Regions:
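Extended, non-catalytic subsegments within catalytic or DNA/protein-binding/adaptor domains
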Residues: 1-203
Length: 203
């Protein structure tokens, strides 16, 4: 409840819901009681929705059922690329999976995803990852912020991130990059407007 109150002035209600979902999944996976189901949390979320009501301008957030469908498609595509030796396709789909899962569980916007850098992400095996962003919406002091994401038993953003940077051999620079038809990974990041279309192509 305190977490919701702290971030209510700077985060949209849909982003808060996504973060609650990630917290809920982590506690369930670890065998802990789910704190997000408490009456206090529901009451605080309802109050935030009323107090910080704004016209909804964002696209509807990806729902968990749709996320699972896309992830299943990507899993098949990655397997097919591995068996056929199609490295360009393997790189693209592995990147897209990491982009999708990290964007979903952290509620990152497209501009935040493309600004992520490998050297600013710290992974703790079996626990989660911490992503530092130098520029974020609502960061009035321009000091940057650290976003934490837990490791999950499935649809795990940490596993997907590790798979992508390992496959692409990335040690620094942008996390999510362009890939040409020959499988060359570019030095520069994806364009801010290109991340969403990448995830719509399977459907």
């Amino acid at each position: 409840a305190r977490y919701l109150a702290d971030y209510a002035p700077t985060l949209a209600i849909n982003t808060l819901r996504l973060r609650l979902a990630a917290l809920s999944r982590w506690h369930t996976d670890q065998g802990f009681a789910d704190p997000t189901k408490s009456p206090l949390v529901r009451q605080v979320l309802k109050g935030i929705r009323s107090l910080h009501a704004v016209p909804e301008k964002r696209a509807r957030p990806l729902e968990l059922a749709v996320l699972q469908q896309i992830d299943q498609w990507l899993d098949v595509a990655i397997g097919n690329a591995q068996r056929s030796g199609d490295r360009p396709a393997l790189l693209r789909q592995t990147r897209n999976r990491s982009l999708m899962l990290l964007g979903f569980w952290r509620g990152f916007r497209s501009d935040e995803l493309v600004n992520l850098r490998v050297e600013n992400i710290e992974v703790t095996p079996g626990q989660g990852m911490a992503c530092y962003l130098g520029r974020t919406k609502g960061d009035r002091q321009l000091q940057g912020r650290v976003f934490k994401c837990p490791a999950l038993s499935r649809l795990c953003p940490v596993t997907a991130f590790n798979a992508w940077v390992s496959l692409a051999g990335l040690t620094e620079g942008p996390v999510f990059r362009k890939i040409d038809r020959w499988g060359h990974v570019a030095e520069e990041s994806l364009h801010v407007n290109s991340s969403i279309p990448l995830l719509r192509r399977p459907f």
